């Protein structure tokens, strides 16, 4: 006889599902959402749906929820219906700009060390499985935070042993707060904190909801950005509205990598959620497809964010867009670091630049002489600059075309040290069953500055320098041999990890994971050798992730991430 067992997930502070008498909660008036979700999410007499009406999230957050419903609960929705649901919920139950800004790193897919300024014990509870970015880009009622905690425990039972039981923060730095009068249970503390700090109803969302309107983005924009491993980029982007809606656009861009001179042309589509969140793709379906996440400022004259690709979203530039109008815009000068006593050809990038045949209107400050103007276009100006032999060390602002660019150039007398960034990197083995996760390193040159002392506040950051790259063993145990198995680094500083899975050539049939030093070596004009290094952890793939960018289903004979 087969017994029937009932598993109940209990969470401290969990009350009955949303109190029908509460004033909180949003009516769901979108027929596709109601039709697709009402099988499990009940609708009350105010058109509020259980769970759904009591939270607000980013487009990525809503898309992850829809994907989870499809994957785990066999919700039958077409891709078009799923997109429609995400669009509706993101617009009607999204985040205000002020609410999202602290969590932009999450939606921009940045691998950073984030320091949560709130309760460190709650942070410790949450970051055992995901970043705090996942948390701070949501708003919920206190009951809904408790239900989310129960959902975690039901779907991922191991969290009880990882963080949800006992005082998980004991002994951790920053977790010494006075707990008198509080529950010592991590879940109680998290629910109370999150319900107070990230509630459903906020003044910011009330104000933005009343002010939200269709974005007016059509026109020409100048691009300035920076891609690790490639350097600064400059160009233009054209946005056009489509007939499919007031929040849908097409884009076409042309930009140049200033360091290499490589010119790139892209075309794509974008949607704007919640009135200010650009989500797009350029060159879709190709090997060089980029996903686009940008934050549109309130004046709709500027937007910024990240364009990225890669299995772990690890490749791509940071970008800033400024709308081109009648007034000239100067976005950058390359090269930026100019040595005393030398003449250098530089390119000034921007938009609506005036036709200039002499240097009388160009002002780079004291100690900088304007030479021959070799090219003058509306988006770039090529000119010869000579730095006086006795020019003062430091940054110079650029004044021209009734426009200003702060720290346009850096006057220096040589490179005194280099630094490898990031100081700590992470790559993921892959290529057999899971995709590889790459890590890009750069060497940044520094000058000691006016005081000629290393590591002081007046040091001058000179930008990327051309170095030779190599790996060294990060010795953690006797006979450590990680360097022989983890992977390799190329001349551009891009680390490629080895295959995932068991390696029979390695002692103990271990995986190709481990720690190494990434070493950069630079030879100065004077023949001195400068060296710097960074730590690299080569770890396992992400075996399970509800990734909103990827389809549900196998592809390319590789297992899903998610």
Question: Which residues does each PLM region occupy?
Answer:
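Gly/Gly-Pro-rich "capping" loops immediately C-terminal to redox-active cysteine motifs
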Residues: 30, 42-72, 131-158, 265
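C-terminal capping alpha-helices of c-type cytochrome domains
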Residues: 74-104, 158, 163-209, 520
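Central antiparallel beta-sheet cores of small beta-barrel/beta-sandwich binding domains
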Residues: 211, 215-299, 304-315
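Beta-strand/beta-sandwich contexts
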Residues: 322-361, 405-455, 542-562
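Immunoglobulin-like IPT/TIG beta-sandwich domains and homologous Ig-like subdomains
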Residues: 340-402, 463-466, 476-477, 483-486, ...
